């Protein structure tokens, strides 16, 4: 991927590309080992009520936004994302160790979540580094990013079933220590194999900047992605408890459902990346929203394991297109601001968690877990309204 003699090009190209793929997978697996079981961990191990579970997700998202915005400002100013990613991996590993051995709700919320926020920021910083690397080496950024996103989805194929197997078959301690190992290996890979890409002084920015262009459309896209990720967060928080406590189905089904959706997301992301220039990002996002609408209607009606698994195709289209195209949409609306654009996109995920944590906790506390899917349906309808007003790029 570097400009080098022909004889050396294949080796350099393969090494750098493989390193990015492995790091994308490892950052994905570290998250996929923790997030799917977190609501069950808080309920069964920490003994938190539904409202406290929702508040935990909300607080986690708020702290995550503060941390990621701070790191985005430093990364766009300093430009050396490699050391920053390694630093994030180290703190992510420490967070996993804390969750493995501690069961105090407030220690986990204020210290564990603070450390976890740095760990989760390793992923968007890796994508920002990949975008800059693709731009400087002339690689097709859309397809390269889609392939990396597919690696994260591959991690989510393996991660949720493995997380449930480790947590239910052994213990949550074993599960979190496994995630810590993933962070350690990821940090080593980044340090030795990813390129350092310092920015020149004229390109440096003093703070995390607002979009220089397309501000209205960037705001609309922020709302759209926030609502879409919010529905997905509602699903992740609520679905395992809904499956176990209301449908009385096996615990492992929740992990299989998440893994199935992630597996189907991989071809969805690659296809979306291929057709992004031909069909436009806006049309692809519209397709995703329609699939999401059908999915959440299905979740309100379905109760059989086979039907729940079949619905994951719609979920995969919904999240696969959002995950593969949403970040690129931000980057195209904010040219020259790769770090800020990527972090802004990532913060739509975190704001989605804020909304979802509050709604899931309140709905489950007052009504039941099934009622949460009605809130998701309303958010999908609001997304359609916003999507009709944004321009294509």
Swiss-Prot record:
<dbReference type="InterPro" id="IPR011701">
    <property type="entry name" value="MFS"/>
</dbReference>
<keyword id="KW-0472">Membrane</keyword>
<feature type="transmembrane region" description="Helical">
    <location>
        <begin position="105"/>
        <end position="124"/>
    </location>
</feature>
<dbReference type="GO" id="GO:1904659">
    <property type="term" value="P:D-glucose transmembrane transport"/>
</dbReference>
<dbReference type="InterPro" id="IPR020846">
    <property type="entry name" value="MFS_dom"/>
</dbReference>
<dbReference type="GO" id="GO:0036448">
    <property type="term" value="P:cellular response to glucose-phosphate stress"/>
</dbReference>
<keyword id="KW-0762">Sugar transport</keyword>
<comment type="similarity">
    <text>Belongs to the major facilitator superfamily. Set transporter family.</text>
</comment>
<keyword id="KW-0997">Cell inner membrane</keyword>
<feature type="transmembrane region" description="Helical">
    <location>
        <begin position="174"/>
        <end position="194"/>
    </location>
</feature>
<dbReference type="InterPro" id="IPR004750">
    <property type="entry name" value="Sugar_efflux"/>
</dbReference>
<comment type="function">
    <text>Involved in the efflux of sugars. The physiological role may be the detoxification of non-metabolizable sugar analogs. Can transport lactose and glucose.</text>
</comment>
<feature type="transmembrane region" description="Helical">
    <location>
        <begin position="344"/>
        <end position="364"/>
    </location>
</feature>
<feature type="transmembrane region" description="Helical">
    <location>
        <begin position="84"/>
        <end position="101"/>
    </location>
</feature>
<feature type="transmembrane region" description="Helical">
    <location>
        <begin position="52"/>
        <end position="72"/>
    </location>
</feature>
<feature type="transmembrane region" description="Helical">
    <location>
        <begin position="283"/>
        <end position="303"/>
    </location>
</feature>
<dbReference type="InterPro" id="IPR036259">
    <property type="entry name" value="MFS_trans_sf"/>
</dbReference>
<keyword id="KW-1003">Cell membrane</keyword>
<feature type="transmembrane region" description="Helical">
    <location>
        <begin position="308"/>
        <end position="328"/>
    </location>
</feature>
<feature type="transmembrane region" description="Helical">
    <location>
        <begin position="366"/>
        <end position="386"/>
    </location>
</feature>
<dbReference type="GO" id="GO:0005886">
    <property type="term" value="C:plasma membrane"/>
</dbReference>
<dbReference type="GO" id="GO:0005351">
    <property type="term" value="F:carbohydrate:proton symporter activity"/>
</dbReference>
<dbReference type="GO" id="GO:0015767">
    <property type="term" value="P:lactose transport"/>
</dbReference>
<keyword id="KW-1133">Transmembrane helix</keyword>
<keyword id="KW-0812">Transmembrane</keyword>
<dbReference type="Pfam" id="PF07690">
    <property type="entry name" value="MFS_1"/>
</dbReference>
<feature type="transmembrane region" description="Helical">
    <location>
        <begin position="152"/>
        <end position="172"/>
    </location>
</feature>
<protein>
    <recommendedName>
        <fullName>Sugar efflux transporter B</fullName>
    </recommendedName>
</protein>
<feature type="transmembrane region" description="Helical">
    <location>
        <begin position="253"/>
        <end position="273"/>
    </location>
</feature>
<feature type="transmembrane region" description="Helical">
    <location>
        <begin position="219"/>
        <end position="239"/>
    </location>
</feature>
<feature type="transmembrane region" description="Helical">
    <location>
        <begin position="13"/>
        <end position="33"/>
    </location>
</feature>
<keyword id="KW-0813">Transport</keyword>
């Amino acid at each position: 991927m570097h400009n080098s003699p022909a004889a050396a090009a294949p080796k350099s190209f393969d090494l750098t590309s493989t390193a990015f793929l492995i790091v994308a997978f490892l950052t994905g697996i570290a998250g996929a080992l923790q997030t799917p079981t977190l609501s069950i961990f808080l309920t069964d191990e920490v003994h938190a009520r539904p409202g406290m579970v929702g508040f935990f997700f909300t607080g986690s998202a708020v702290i995550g936004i503060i941390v990621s915005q701070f790191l985005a400002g430093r990364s766009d100013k300093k430009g050396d994302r490699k050391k920053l990613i390694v630093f994030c991996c180290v703190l992510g590993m420490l967070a996993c160790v804390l969750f493995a051995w501690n069961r105090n709700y407030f220690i986990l919320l204020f210290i564990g979540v603070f450390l976890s926020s740095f760990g989760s920021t390793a992923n968007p910083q890796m994508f920002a580094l990949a975008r800059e690397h693709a731009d400087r080496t002339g690689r097709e950024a859309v397809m390269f990013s889609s392939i990396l996103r597919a690696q994260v989805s591959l991690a989510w194929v393996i991660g949720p079933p493995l997380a449930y197997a480790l947590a239910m078959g052994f213990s949550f301690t074993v599960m979190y220590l496994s995630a810590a190992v993933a962070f350690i290996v990821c940090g080593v890979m980044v340090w030795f194999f990813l390129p350092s890409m310092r920015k020149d002084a004229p390109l440096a920015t003093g703070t995390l900047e607002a979009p220089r262009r397309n501000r209205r459309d960037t705001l609309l896209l922020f709302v759209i992605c926030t609502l879409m990720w919010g529905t997905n967060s509602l699903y992740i928080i609520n679905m395992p408890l809904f499956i176990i406590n209301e449908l009385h189905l096996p615990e492992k089904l929740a992990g299989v459902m998440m893994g199935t959706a992630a597996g189907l997301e991989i071809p969805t992301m690659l296809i979306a990346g291929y057709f992004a220039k031909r069909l436009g990002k806006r049309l692809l996002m519209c397709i995703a929203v329609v699939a999401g609408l059908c999915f959440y209607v299905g979740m309100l009606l379905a109760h059989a394991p086979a039907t729940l698994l079949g619905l994951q195709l719609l979920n995969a289209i919904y999240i696969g297109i959002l995950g593969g195209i949403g970040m690129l949409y931000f980057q195209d609306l904010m040219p020259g601001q790769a770090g800020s654009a990527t972090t802004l996109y990532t913060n739509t995920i975190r704001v989605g968690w804020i909304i979802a944590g509050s709604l899931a906790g309140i709905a489950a506390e007052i009504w039941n877990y099934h009622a949460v899917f009605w809130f998701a349906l309303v958010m999908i309808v609001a997304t359609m309204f916003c999507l009709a007003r944004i321009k294509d790029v």
